[in-house]
From Swiss-Prot:
Subunit structure: Homodimer. Probably interacts with PlsY.
Pathway stated in the Swiss-Prot or TrEMBL entry: Lipid metabolism; phospholipid metabolism
Enzyme class name: transferase
This protein's encoding gene: plsX
Protein name per Swiss-Prot or TrEMBL: Phosphate acyltransferase
Native source organism of the sequence: Synechococcus elongatus (strain ATCC 33912 / PCC 7942 / FACHB-805)
Similarity comment text for this entry: Belongs to the PlsX family.
HAMAP family (alphabetical): PlsX (MF_00019)
Amino acid sequence: MTRARIAVDAMGGDFAPEEIVKGALRAQEELQADVILVGDPDRLRAICQDHAPHLQVRIEAAEEAIAMEDAAVSVRSRPRASINVAMDLVKAGEADAVISAGHSGAVMASALLRLGRIRGIDRPAIGALLPTVIPGKPVLVLDVGANVDCKPRFLEQFAVMGSIYSRDVLGQANPRVGLVNIGEEDSKGNELALASHQLLRNNPRICFVGNAEGRDVLSGQFDVVVCDGFVGNVLLKFAEAVGSVFLEIIRDELPRGMRGKVGSTLLRRNLRRIKQRLDHAEHGGALLLGVNGICIISHGSSKAPSIYSAIRLAVEAAENRVIDHLHQIQEPPSPAADLVTEPVVS
């Protein structure tokens, strides 16, 4: 099997470049992937030498990096920024995917400007995989931050993209799509929800099963749920927080004393498995669906394990030719779709 080539923005993120490079080196050793580190060559070579001197890793020079406090549109005036250089590798066919833990708005802007949109998509969406009560069966939630304000047709397109990804990458034969709403009834919701419900119900390319209340999103009833980026970002951050709080509560309640130590030892084994299911680092990042290339946006606080998982996600998308499948969408986009907006994901 041909090894996937993954361009890694090594200068993006709170713990760049050290943690980014460590995660990338592990991925090159353990996955069917060749990583391309993009950033300051001297710093990257030094880190590679410290952690994996036996590996041959391609390093692509980039003279600048987009900081978290910079405006997303600064990518327009800084062509040699690390995220732009990484995107250019994908555009030139030298890489199959790009990942970045840097400024999410800049990542999206760079992807739009350099890779362009897939024909038929008005606005790309950020899709995050969240755990459900069914082991190994996450739900794809989109949009989680690229588009704060949406039109009904945007949500319809998110549903089609999410269904294609769920089917062709996650292996769900007939992905069940839900619309995040305040009630199960068709008549519930604001104007966006009501209009979107009508479009989703009448679209033959998706298996729309109805509204998804907040309590149902992680229930395993849905394979894909769609919403605007404002709601999705709140949902994503809340899910991450609940997982962390749940683990802390369990730790606090572990029995103490001699009798409790035996039980605690047994519980901790299960606790590790629970942590793996709830930890967002297990998925490593969110997919920017709708641009003409595979792009993974990792959390700004990502460390090596998250970067490794993000590269694994990118490899799966590349091996399953997700972009080829997304090109099934052939409706012409609207004229207003070329606008680069400021996403809310942090």
